[in-house]
């Protein structure tokens, strides 16, 4: 089975923490950095707190000096459609729950220490519905059509080191009817601020597969994309460590490669795990791939990818086999909202849904 870091970043389901190192800093409700450890190889912070929101269009709201004092204060995730008012005259129609849609704006003020100036700083958005556009300090970063995929933007060239920074997000769900189900509106999933060194594992840069699986041994294939954003070539050493559920390193592999300036290289490693604990529905055992990148003796990045070791096979005569055992697949009609909470669904709701599916 395959495991990319992308699929694990979106909700952090069932408590699988995606952070590479411990969260090295945090933002308070006012968007101020309240702690920092600049020596960390990688920093990944929740960016959910201290946002301002306006329901409706607000021309010029992308500019850092725009007056947002009277905007509503809130934390993410957020779905404005579920807040109503609901009316049969809403263009979303019956399939959209007669919910209000339209345009909404989000703004967040934040400050970073001057020590971040040598890092690449990105914003990651796990889901915005829909047709979002993002600015940093008045500079346009891009548009994400539709609204279910996660995406990221590089903030680095436009940041004010040590000064005030403003992220603005315009969400446009005004083209209605647009769905055969309730979609919600807004930044309905988590947001993150990520700071890395110039040499680092690329965004969603790991891909883990388990092409050979048995109770005696498993072959783990690891593909890792490392970027060098320095102006000179760098000889990089990648250490891939497989860590079990108790935090014990069960196997490691090292590989080195010179990567040219402003270039990217994909490493490939084959790692054997003896007597693996197999992932199954009854016992969903998880390992972690810990990727450490060094240039010389300096650790420049650390990155973790959760994965399970299992074999999945579809057979015309025996049906679906998981680790060689027949498993009956049950399906349900499930959309991404959760009733009265709309599309900004708490993780525990998703966990409970999976528990019900497991017990069917």
Residue ranges and their predicted role:
Residues 219-257:
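Beta-strand-rich binding/interaction modules
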Residues 57, 96, 101-204, 229:
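Accessory beta-strand-rich segments of carbohydrate-active enzymes
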Residues 1-9, 20-22, 26, 34:
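N-terminal secretory signal peptides
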Residues 103, 162, 217, 260-264:
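Solvent-exposed, conformationally flexible loop/turn segments
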Residues 118-119, 159-164, 274-286:
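Short glycine/proline/serine/threonine-rich loop/turn segments at secondary-structure transition edges
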Residues 252-275:
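Intrinsically disordered, low-complexity Pro/Gly/Ser/Thr-rich segments with frequent PxxP/GP/PP motifs
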Residues 12, 16-20, 31-92, 166-170, ...:
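Accessory carbohydrate-binding/adhesion or oligomerization-edge regions at the termini
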Residues 82-112, 116-124, 130-135, 204-206, ...:
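Active-site-adjacent substrate/metal-binding segments within catalytic domains
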């Amino acid at each position: 089975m395959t495991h990319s870091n992308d699929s694990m970043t979106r909700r952090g389901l069932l408590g699988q923490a995606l952070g590479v190192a411990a969260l090295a800093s945090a933002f308070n409700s006012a968007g101020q950095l309240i702690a920092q450890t600049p020596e960390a190889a990688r920093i990944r912070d929740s960016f959910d707190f201290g946002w301002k929101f306006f329901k409706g269009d607000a021309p010029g709201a992308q500019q850092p000096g725009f007056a947002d004092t009277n905007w509503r204060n809130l934390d993410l995730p957020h779905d404005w459609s579920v807040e109503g008012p609901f009316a049969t005259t809403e263009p979303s129609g019956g399939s959209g729950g007669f919910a209000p849609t339209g345009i909404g704006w989000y703004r967040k003020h934040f400050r970073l220490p001057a020590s971040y100036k040598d890092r690449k700083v990105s914003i990651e958005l796990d889901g915005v519905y829909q047709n979002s556009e993002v600015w940093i300090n008045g500079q346009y970063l891009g548009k994400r059509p539709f609204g279910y995929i996660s995406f990221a933007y590089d903030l680095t060239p436009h940041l004010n080191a040590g000064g005030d920074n403003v992220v603005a997000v315009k969400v446009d769900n005004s083209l209605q009817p647009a769905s055969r189900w309730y979609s919600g509106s807004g930044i309905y999933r988590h947001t993150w601020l990520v700071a890395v060194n110039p040499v680092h594992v690329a965004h969603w840069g790991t891909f883990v597969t388990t092409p050979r699986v048995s109770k005696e041994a498993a072959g783990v294939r690891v593909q890792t994309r490392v970027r060098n954003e320095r102006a000179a070539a760098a000889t990089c050493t990648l250490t891939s460590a497989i860590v079990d559920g108790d935090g014990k390193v069960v196997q490691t592999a090292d590989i080195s490669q010179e990567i040219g300036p402003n270039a990217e290289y994909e490493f490939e490693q084959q790692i054997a795990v003896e007597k693996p604990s197999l992932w199954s529905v009854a016992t969903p055992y998880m390992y972690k791939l810990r990727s450490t990148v060094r240039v010389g003796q300096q650790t420049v990045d650390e990155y973790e990818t959760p994965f399970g070791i299992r074999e999945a096979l579809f057979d015309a005569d025996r049906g679906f086999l998981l680790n060689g055992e027949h498993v009956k697949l049950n399906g349900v009609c499930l959309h991404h909202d959760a009733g009265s909470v709309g599309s900004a669904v708490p993780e525990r709701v998703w966990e409970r849904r999976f528990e019900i599916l497991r017990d069917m």
